[in-house]
Amino acid sequence: MKAKIVLVHFPFTDLSGSKLRPALVIHEGEQDVIVAFISSEIPSSIQESDLLITKDHPAFRSTGLKISSVIKFDKIATLSKTLIEGEIGKVLPGLADECNTIMHQFFRF
């Protein structure tokens, strides 16, 4: 399931609720997944933790996203696989490399 784009109930940062939205699976465990939030609200300034995927990106069609979106690697969550509502697409190798580069640069732990 890693590198798949799924629909999940992604929690709000204050844990007051959640919203069904697309997310990128960045790790799959036995019962849980770690996902990165995907938003169609493109910020005026892209952060170092963001990956913008525009409709003209060569890998856009495979993602299953409907409009240009941003993957927010500063908004990740570990969620039960039971919260996944469905799979809408996947990340092809070139786009996966872009994701890995951003995660490596951003987390530098």
What are these regions (language model features)?
Residues 11-15:
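Short, charged beta-turn/beta-strand-edge "cap" motif at the junction between a beta-strand
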Residues 58-109:
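C-terminal terminal-subdomain/extension
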